[in-house]
């Protein structure tokens, strides 16, 4: 493995960490309705538990309401029950073959909890990025130790990896700040 390979794989892994972090952030509830909020809900479908998105169409009805359209009419009650029993604190209402999921307004205390959760997710993502930086630097040091790269190459590679790390951490900070803004907006 060369220094270029190490830098390339490190950047790719950091990008994957950012993508996973964005996915986790999307699941944190804000005052607005977000169809991704229901991604974690599983419904019993012919004896097995399947994600809600595999048995129904989940869409945004308006800023504070999510609509869930079951593909099979007999699934309505099961979907409604699964949403109600989730830890999201939602109260779905069935309207024929459409299930409306209104988003209750969040209290100030709940908003602060969600902000803390977003920050802790951000810290977790930063730790993952820093661990990738450490792994890359150790890989470069091993190349120098094995006489496959010079110490000058090591310094340049470590500086490049640090720049990549700084870029990704700045992106995480921006995402957390945007999420906090979204949570605190009434």
From Swiss-Prot:
GO MF assignments: ribosomal large subunit binding
Gene Ontology CC annotations of this record: cytosol
Organism taxonomic ancestry: Bacteria, Pseudomonadati, Pseudomonadota, Betaproteobacteria, Burkholderiales
Keyword terms: Cytoplasm, Protein biosynthesis
Organism: Acidovorax ebreus (strain TPSY) (Diaphorobacter sp. (strain TPSY))
InterPro entries: Ribosome_recyc_fac, Ribosome_recyc_fac_dom, RRF_sf
The protein's name in its UniProt record: Ribosome-recycling factor
Function: Responsible for the release of ribosomes from messenger RNA at the termination of protein biosynthesis. May increase the efficiency of translation by recycling ribosomes from one round of translation to another.
Similarity remark: Belongs to the RRF family.
Signal peptide: none
